[in-house]
């Protein structure tokens, strides 16, 4: 199935008219949140950037600054995230995951494990342009051990291209993983890192099937038993992304909302970053794998303008 987003270019787009609508929504007493959210969720990211340009030209004001001063809370965070240029968004999230006192490994793991080599190469370039530092160096400075090594291997973006599959190599890799984990006292983490980080996606899918045949275990079960902490989370994220990126991100969204409290940072990040890439596919996987739809879960887990805007980005119910 081809990947598709839920947000596309608005037909008959008029950036100047949109800028005027937004100014009117924020001028004077009170703010017309409905106008803001209805307009921005129905425009693509490129169109939002154009609106911001027109806004500056017409009013001499910064649209994002105005939105920040008029909106509050989670709704403000969501709208500000939607206004970030798409090509900057992942780099921005990684920078913030690495900045300050603690490192947000969850964000590093999710983004670096689920982006394609092409996407990772683009992220590295944008990161350097925007922040004047090297993403790989920053990751190395903020992480350690095998977790760090796996991140660095993924950031090389040197995964083999998908070409004809060599059955003998599939067998060798599956055996090597079995010997590096289940058959060994201790674990040879290097072996997992090399195979998971450099083989092609279609090759690895076959390796996981072969591994099941040889060992009687799903590769995820072995990772669970043989590794722990950040490395375990990263290896699992890589395996899930190899199997299906939309399914991995659907699961990420599910656990961001399941149980008490909501991880709004993750909810916003995944919905915004994937809205023009594969959010439609994520929705389908969500419905297939969980007893509810993404739309219903957002509806039950959020409130107010924040909920309205997220549901519009989600783009519909899946019965």
From Swiss-Prot:
Keywords: Acetylation, Annexin, Blood coagulation, Calcium, Calcium/phospholipid-binding, Hemostasis, Isopeptide bond, Phosphoprotein, Repeat, S-nitrosylation, Ubl conjugation. Gene3D superfamilies: Annexin (1.10.220.10). The modification N6-succinyllysine is found at residue 288. This is Annexin A5. The gene is Anxa5. There is a cross-link at residue 27 (Glycyl lysine isopeptide (Lys-Gly) (interchain with G-Cter in SUMO1)). It comes from the Eukaryota. InterPro entries: Annexin, Annexin_repeat, Annexin_repeat_CS, Annexin_sf, ANX5.
